Amino acid sequence: MAFFSRLNLQEGLQTFFVLQWIPVYIFLGAIPILLIPYFLLFSKFWPLAVLSLAWLTYDWNTHSQGGRRSAWVRNWTLWKYFRNYFPVKLVKTHDLSPKHNYIIANHPHGILSFGVFINFATEATGIARIFPSITPFVGTLERIFWIPIVREYVMSMGVCPVSSSALKYLLTQKGSGNAVVIVVGGAAEALLCRPGASTLFLKQRKGFVKMALQTGAYLVPSYSFGENEVFNQETFPEGTWLRLFQKTFQDTFKKILGLNFCTFHGRGFTRGSWGFLPFNRPITTVVGEPLPIPRIKRPNQKTVDKYHALYISALRKLFDQHKVEYGLPETQELTIT
C-alpha cells in the first residue's frame, strides 16, 4: 500500500507541475497587463506601475544581449517532475566543442515544444553534463519580453528572442561555446503536427541558415521524437461548416496576434479521460552532428540554398538513423513541405 501511495504521489506531482506550466505564464502575463493600467489610472499604487515601466525601459536591451540566466531557476526540482511526466530525454550523438558557437535547429514544433523547453531551458535532463562548456539559449517570440515579470522569468531560464539582433549578439559578441536552439518550423509547423506524423515546414525556412553563414555558427540538426504524440490535433473535413469556421478563426487569430491557433486536446486528470493535459508519451530529443559553416558577411541566395540543402540532408540522415529506436516504423519517411 505504501508503494502505491508513493507512486500516486509522484504521478500527482508530475501532473500538477505540467498543468501549471501554461497557466503560470498566462497568470504572470495577466498581472502586469491588467494591473499596470489599473494602478496608473485608478489606484494609489500608481508609483509601482511607474517603477515597473521605468525598469522595463531602462532594461529594454537586456533580453537581446544574453539576458539574465539563473542556474537556481534552471535547476528547480519541479522541472524533474515535469521531465518524468512524459518522460523527456536528451541524446547526444556527437560532442560540441566549446571553441565554436552553434545554431541547434529543432524539429518538429509540436503543439507546445515540450522537448526543447525541458532539454534546453532547464537542467532536468542534464544538458550541462551532456554538453559540458556549452551554454544553451532557447529562441522564442520577442513580444514575450515586452511583458514585465514574464520577461524576468523566461530570461532566468536562458530564453532569448529569436530576432536577428539577439541571435547575432549571442553568436558573435558573447565569446564561444554558445548554442542557440531554434524551433525552425514555428507556429506554421504546429498546424501539421498530429500523432504518427513526421511532416516539417522547412522548405522556405532559410533564415536560420543565413544567420549561421553571417555569424559562422555551426548548424546542428536535432529531432524530438514523440513531440507530435502528446496531443491530438483536430482538423475538420474540408467542405464542412466546421472546417470553414475553423479556418476563418485561425486566419483571423493569425492576423491579429501573428500566431497560429491549433484545435487540440490531450488527456484529463485521470488516464483515459479527455482534457488539455498532454498524453504521457516519451519525448526523446536527439542532437546530431554539427555541420561546419563558413562565415560570410553577405551570403548570396545560391550559398544559402546550398547550405540549406546540406542541412536537410543531415537532418534526414539523423531521422532515419534513430526513428526505429524511438518508436517509428522503418517505413516512416520525413516529409518536408
UniProtKB/Swiss-Prot annotation:
Ranges that cross the membrane: 22-42, 102-122
Disulfide bridges in this chain: none
Any GO BP annotation: monoacylglycerol biosynthetic process
GO cellular component entries: endoplasmic reticulum membrane
Cited Pfam families: DAGAT
Tissue specificity remark: Expressed in all tissues tested except pancreas.
Intracellular or extracellular location(s): Endoplasmic reticulum membrane
Keywords noted in UniProt: Acyltransferase, Endoplasmic reticulum, Lipid biosynthesis, Lipid metabolism, Membrane, Transferase, Transmembrane, Transmembrane helix
Catalytic activity from the UniProt record: 1,2-di-(9Z-octadecenoyl)-sn-glycerol + (9Z)-octadecenoyl-CoA = 1,2,3-tri-(9Z-octadecenoyl)-glycerol + CoA; 1-O-(9Z-octadecenyl)-glycerol + (9Z)-octadecenoyl-CoA = 1-O-(9Z-octadecyl)-3-(9Z-octadecenoyl)-glycerol + CoA; 1-(9Z-octadecenoyl)-glycerol + (9Z)-octadecenoyl-CoA = 1,2-di-(9Z-octadecenoyl)-glycerol + CoA
Matches recorded under CDD domains: LPLAT_MGAT-like (cd07987)
Highest taxon of the lineage: Eukaryota
EC number: 2.3.1.-
Membrane topology: Multi-pass membrane protein
Primary subcellular site in the record, as a coarse category: endoplasmic reticulum
Molecular functions per Gene Ontology: diacylglycerol O-acyltransferase activity; O-acyltransferase activity
PANTHER family xref list: DIACYLGLYCEROL O-ACYLTRANSFERASE (PTHR12317), DIACYLGLYCEROL O-ACYLTRANSFERASE 2-LIKE PROTEIN 6 (PTHR12317:SF19)
The family this protein is said to belong to: Belongs to the diacylglycerol acyltransferase family.
Described function: Diglyceride acyltransferase that uses fatty acyl-CoA as substrate. Particularly active with oleate as a substrate. Has no wax synthase activity to produce wax esters. Able to use 1-monoalkylglycerol (1-MAkG) as an acyl acceptor for the synthesis of monoalkyl-monoacylglycerol (MAMAG).
Record protein name field: Diacylglycerol O-acyltransferase 2-like protein 6
Origin species: Homo sapiens (Human)
Source lineage: Eukaryota, Metazoa, Chordata, Craniata, Vertebrata
